């Protein structure tokens, strides 16, 4: 008989080789800034917990960001040797003095082994599995941890057709098919992923968890889906409102004298280069439309950032560069011609 747990705390740990993108992915899943991101090894030095989702019943899902593996081969040997006194001494005492990063790795992995329910193992998809020498050693580390593993393919590059993505995922599945601890392989780029991929991840996590977590995890998964769907629908509504406002926006162009028309034509063909055209009614109307579009776009950007739990600045220069170059100007028809 399986005992159900209702107020469970389920722990997920993101692990990977150093500088693969663990903290970036954690930020994406958490929808908030955590830790430090830099293009160097060993930026994260401790295992840190972050609440991912919770429900009224008391169930919680916790995401742990961990230090990246450095020398995976030596680290695997250290972990495997911890069961004997000399191995323990080297790992706990010697490495603490002589190899601080390896000592921190061991402390973090001991914690992962003791508390984690599912391990999320991040790899660099830009490399072929057989061309990533650290993977074999890190599979030994994950086997030592002894928890179910879901492999996530990061750094997938530009979005590609679904068939190509499936082939890439299958290539990694084939390379890891001898590893019993690996329960699934998924594409999960920290930048190019979408919420549908997150749903697939949550499905895989549920299948990897022990049966006692079935009910609380179902509640957590449902809450996560609703949270993500709400953000998606709010984002879609905001974008739709912006597009609709731009499509229906217009500005009246004032009529100009014959002399001003001649000057405008002359400037357009290279004559009157120094002519003052600040009074050009068409330019005034275009400027008015662009300013409204800029204001609305900045409002949209702030709304999308808030809805999706992001921070940062948006640079709309490219968009408004195109707006200033692409125009449709409708003119009133002559009454005499309209009567024909």
Residues of each region from the PLM?
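Conserved G1/Walker A P-loop phosphate-binding module
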Residues: 1-88
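Short, conserved acidic/polar surface loops in the N-terminal third of protein domains
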Residues: 73-77, 131-132, 161-164, 198-199
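Hydrophobic, Leu/Ile/Phe/Ala-enriched alpha-helical segments that form helix-helix packing faces
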Residues: 29, 33, 172-176, 205, ...
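Conserved NTP-handling cores and scaffolds of large molecular machines
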Residues: 29, 33, 70, 120, ...
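Canonical P-loop GTPase G-domain recognition
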Residues: 155-223
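Alpha-helix N-cap/loop-to-helix initiation residues
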Residues: 43, 128-131, 194
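Extended helical scaffolds that flank P-loop GTPase cores
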Residues: 195-198, 205-340
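Conserved C-terminal guanine-recognition region of P-loop GTPase G domains, centered on the G4
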Residues: 83-184
């Amino acid at each position: 008989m399986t005992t159900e747990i209702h107020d469970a705390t389920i722990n997920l740990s993101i692990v990977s080789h150093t500088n693969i993108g663990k903290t970036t992915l954690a930020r994406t899943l958490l929808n908030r800034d955590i830790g430090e991101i830099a293009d160097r090894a060993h930026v994260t030095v401790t295992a840190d917990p972050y609440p991912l989702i919770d429900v009224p019943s008391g169930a919680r899902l916790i995401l742990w960001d961990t230090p990246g593996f450095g020398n995976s081969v030596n680290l695997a040997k250290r972990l495997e040797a911890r069961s004997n006194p000399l191995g323990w001494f080297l790992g706990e005492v010697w490495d603490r003095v002589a190899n601080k990063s390896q000592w921190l790795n061991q402390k973090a992995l001991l914690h992962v082994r003791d508390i984690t329910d599912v391990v999320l193992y991040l790899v660099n998809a830009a490399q072929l599995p057989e061309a990533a020498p650290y993977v074999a050693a890190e599979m030994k580390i994950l086997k030592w941890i002894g928890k179910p593993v879901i492999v996530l393919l990061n750094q997938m590059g530009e979005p590609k057709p679904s068939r190509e993505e499936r082939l890439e995922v299958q290539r990694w599945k084939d390379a890891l098919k001898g590893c019993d601890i690996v329960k699934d392989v998924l594409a999960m780029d920290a930048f190019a992923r979408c919420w549908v991929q997150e749903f697939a991840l949550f499905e895989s996590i549920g299948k990897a968890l022990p049966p006692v977590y079935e009910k609380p995890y179902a509640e957590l998964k449902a809450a996560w889906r609703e949270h993500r769907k709400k953000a998606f629908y709010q984002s879609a509504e905001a974008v739709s409102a912006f597009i609709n406002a731009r499509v229906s926006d217009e500005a009246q162009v004032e009529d100009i004298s014959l002399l001003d028309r001649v000057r405008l034509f002359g400037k357009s063909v290279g004559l009157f280069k120094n002519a003052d055209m600040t009074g050009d009614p068409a330019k005034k109307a275009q400027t008015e439309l662009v300013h409204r579009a800029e204001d609305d776009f900045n409002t949209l950007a702030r709304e999308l950032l808030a809805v999706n739990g992001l921070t940062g600045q948006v640079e709309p220069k490219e968009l408004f560069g195109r707006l200033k170059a692409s125009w449709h100007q409708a003119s009133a028809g002559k009454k005499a011609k309209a009567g024909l």
